[in-house]
Structures are given as C-alpha cells and as structure tokens.
C-alpha cells in the first residue's frame, strides 16, 4: 500500500501542463490520498446514515416502460400502454400517417395525396408536414391529446410528419423507429441508371 502512495505522489509531482513555463501545477503529498481502512469504514457508515435518513420513494424513470412492466408515469390519467399511436410510413414517393387507439382502432388518417399533393410533390417534406397537421386535427376531434409515434421508412417526410403532428396540437410522448432492415434477406432490385 505504501508503494502505491509513493508512486502516486511521484506521478502528481512530475505532471505539468505544457504552457506552464516549468511551473509545477499539481504538487500534493501522498498523505492526502485516502486509502486507509478507517476512512473507508467512516465513509460507508456515513452513506448508510444518509440512506436511512432519505425518504423512501418509488423508482422513477423517464424512459418508456418495458412491455409487461408497470410504470408510475401518467399522461392525462392514462398509462403508457393506453396512449394512442401515430404510425408514420415515410416512403420516397409519399408519407402516410394513421392515428390508432391503444386497442388498434383507427382514429384518423392522412397522407400527402389526400391533402392535395400530386405526383413528385407527395415525396416532399412540406407535403408530409401538411399531412401531419391534418392528421393531428382529425385526431384532436376524437379527443386525442397525447400520442406515441412509430416511424417506418427512410423517406424525406419522416421528420416533417412528426413536426406536423406537434404543430397540430398533439403532445408526443415517445418516438419509435420501426424501419425494417434486412439481415441479408432478399436480393435488392437493381440500381437506377440516371
């Protein structure tokens, strides 16, 4: 134990910053490093007293609960599993948003095509944001305040659709990415020649 103290003291005395012009920055004696068994016992006793003095409380987590696990978090009196889900399917050509209840009953649907965008304009971020605002307005008419968002696909409207839901007045509780990723599955189609 004494060798460790001396080695630590030597290291602290020899260490300097590059721009200190030969000045020693950290010079501490080896005695200040707490390694004694008595100090460890005192620290453990102090920690035990603090734990006993602290009021007992339930475990709190800001993360969504694991399926089957009970959570103390509530949104407007509803559990996490009871909050409606907004499914966003963002392809390269279109973005579709469907809001369903916790029991998977459809509440609202909107896509870039139903909002008046045609052809290549359906695949833009503005169209996805407009569809998000429309889906949020229809869901609010059914009494939805909080939603969970599940995003599927890598299209240009995936983030814009979420912003549209927020702009429409819905409060997003969680965002889940459910994009399918093949683990060397089917052979992909040939690359486009532009």
From Swiss-Prot:
Presence of the UniProt keyword Ribosomal protein in the record: yes
HAMAP family: Ribosomal_uS11
GO MF entries: RNA binding; structural constituent of ribosome
Gene assigned in the entry: MRPS11
Main location: mitochondrion
Location within or outside the cell: Mitochondrion
Protein name: Small ribosomal subunit protein uS11m
Entry similarity comment: Belongs to the universal ribosomal protein uS11 family.
Record has Cell wall biogenesis/degradation as a keyword: no
